[in-house]
Regions:
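Extended active-site neighborhood of metal-dependent phosphoesterases/phosphodiesterases
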Residues: 54, 116-146, 199-301, 325-337, ...
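Short, well-ordered beta-to-alpha junction loops that form the rim of enzyme active sites
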Residues: 120-121, 263, 310-314, 342
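Conserved, compact domain cores that house catalytic/ligand-binding motifs in diverse enzymes
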Residues: 153-231
């Protein structure tokens, strides 16, 4: 009996050691730290591009390229003049982003030059800590863009507004835009009724805009009051922020200096409908300081032949009763034109009607504004969805000092 117990103990110990060795080998096979160059697995799984590419916030030396995929993927952009001999691989805190929304900034471009580009995304099947499982790569067709350049003699652009999730409206307006070549398109806000999901942002705005702009015409976006509303409104900037991470910015193209303002909400923060979740008072106060600085101190405001301000609300939005000071600042800077939306019907507010020394153009929902600027004049035409002329006028260059 005694020897049987000893034999049983020895057998149990051997079994335990054997199982431990097997487990150790299994762990070693799972995480072979001694050979990090063992190839990762690649599966026959290719993502599809579901939106884009869309060119956003063009400048003279940079541009944002956005697209979306139907499955988690990485993203990169190849670009160049004549051949795709440069590549941008984005990083966030040292890691390549993985997801379905892809946003890459191409920097270091030359002003007024035309580039070709192509986006690519590789499927990430399983984002494991070691040897992530990868899939195959999808590439877009090759598109092109031309950077802004202050040395250009002329610039042409179109403006639309308040599309409010109406895909058919976007399709009709962008089709109308392309009847005459333009360098870029401005959307002055309220692309959605309120922001609730990524699919809504994609399906009701980004995808139809990207399709309509044909991967060649850049979009400049101005935030509207409806863009403040909904559970995803706080993430809306992930899709439409300018390059510096905000909604207020300036851009220059040819004889044109552009000032993009965020006119905020149309009611005070304390209005019950907001439940105390807005703080436009502080936000607009900071924006007011920025606006004064841009108009008074930014050299191009005085040097450019024409300065155009873009905003959603033609009365500057809710600014705690200080609408007059915004108009006065614009008057002092001798801006040439303010283009807005918000009212859903066309208005041409002429100088002097509301204390303004400049015309205010309020674009209707189903209209396209075409603007062409040269060193001496700025011509404006407004057409409806049928292409019928609604209004037309010309502004002559005026002294800025």
């Amino acid at each position: 009996m005694k020897w049987n117990k000893v034999l049983f103990t020895v057998m149990a110990l051997c079994t335990s050691l054997l199982l431990g060795a097997v487990a150790a080998e299994a762990r070693k096979a799972a995480v072979p730290d001694d050979d990090p160059n063992v190839p990762y697995r690649t599966f026959d799984s290719t993502p599809a591009i579901t939106m884009g590419p869309l060119l956003l916030d063009m400048s003279d030396t940079s541009v944002i390229v956005e697209w979306m995929t139907d499955a988690p993927s990485d993203g990169r952009v190849s670009y160049g003049e004549g051949k795709l001999d440069h590549e941008v691989v984005p990083q966030m805190d040292g890691m390549v982003p993985v997801g379905t929304m892809h946003r890459v900034v191409i920097e270091g471009l030359a002003p007024g030059r035309t580039y070709q580009y192509c986006v690519a995304s590789r499927r990430v099947v399983a984002l494991k800590p070691y040897w992530p499982d990868m899939g195959k790569t999808v590439e877009s067709a090759v598109g092109s863009f031309t950077t802004f350049g202050a040395a250009k003699k002329t610039t042409r652009f179109a403006v639309i507004t308040d599309t409010h999730e109406n895909v058919e409206r976007i399709q009709a307006l962008t089709s109308l835009i392309h009847q005459v070549p333009v360098d870029f398109v401005v959307h002055t806000g309220d692309s959605l009724n309120y922001v609730v999901s990524e699919n809504q942002i994609k399906d009701r705005f980004l995808e139809p805009m990207a399709t309509g702009l044909k991967a060649t015409t850049p979009l400049l976006y101005v935030r509207g009051n409806h863009d403040y509303r909904g559970e995803m409104a706080r993430s809306f900037g992930d899709y439409l922020h300018a390059q510096d991470g905000g909604y207020v910015y300036t851009r220059d193209d040819g004889p044109l200096h552009m000032v993009m303002v965020d006119t905020g909400e149309d009611k005070p923060d304390g209005t019950q409908v907001y439940a105390g979740l807005n703080n436009l008072r502080d936000y607009r106060t900071r924006e007011w300081a920025w606006f004064r600085h841009v108009l008074a101190d930014e050299p191009r405001t005085k040097a450019a032949p024409f300065t155009v301000v873009f905003g959603h609300d033609p009365s500057w939005g809710w600014v705690d009763g200080q609408e007059t000071q915004w108009t006065q600042a614009a008057n002092q800077a001798r801006i040439d034109l303010f283009i807005a939306g918000h009212e859903h019907h066309y208005q041409h507010i002429k100088p002097g009607e509301h204390g303004n020394d400049f015309p205010v153009l309020v674009v209707g929902q189903d209209q396209v504004v075409r603007v062409e600027a040269s060193d001496t004049e700025l011509t404006v035409k407004v057409v409806d969805r049928a292409g019928k002329l609604v209004d037309a006028f010309t502004l002559r260059r005026k002294p800025k000092s």
